[in-house]
């Protein structure tokens, strides 16, 4: 069985946002692999700890220091100082994630969740494309 769906997420503020429930609520009851791909170049996806909200703050702080908007050497800034830095952060974190699912239940670790990493100061709703491969 192969199942695909496009999900348009609501607009999020800059930062790291848990979207596990938005994805899982749209999945069929099956066993296999879920692949999630974001159709944008200035946002990314990751799987990480979902229990302590300070993790999200620390992620944002770290990536803002690693790829600073205060650097004036970027030339791709047509849409603002967060333009090129968003592309770099997206390249570092990646545009897709995968996780196993068993009988409709994601087999993520106890403290794992799927994050939308929004790198822009202002962004519209992001589109993710979800592919499920497996059987019932």
Can you name each region flagged by the protein language model?
Residues 1-136:
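Active-site histidine-anchored catalytic micro-motif
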């Amino acid at each position: 069985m192969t199942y695909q769906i496009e999900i348009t997420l609501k607009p999020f503020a800059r930062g790291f946002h848990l979207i596990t429930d938005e994805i899982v609520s749209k999945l069929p009851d099956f066993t296999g692999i879920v692949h999630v791909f974001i159709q944008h170049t200035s946002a990314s996806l990751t799987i990480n700890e979902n229990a302590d909200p300070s993790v999200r703050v620390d992620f944002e702080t770290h990536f803002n220091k690693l790829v600073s908007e205060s650097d004036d050497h970027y030339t791709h800034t047509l849409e603002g100082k967060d333009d090129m830095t968003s592309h770099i952060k997206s390249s570092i974190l990646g545009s897709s994630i995968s996780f196993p699912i068993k009988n409709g239940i994601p087999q993520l670790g106890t403290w794992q969740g799927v994050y939308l990493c929004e790198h822009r100061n202002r962004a519209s709703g992001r589109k993710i494309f979800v592919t499920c491969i497996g059987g019932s």
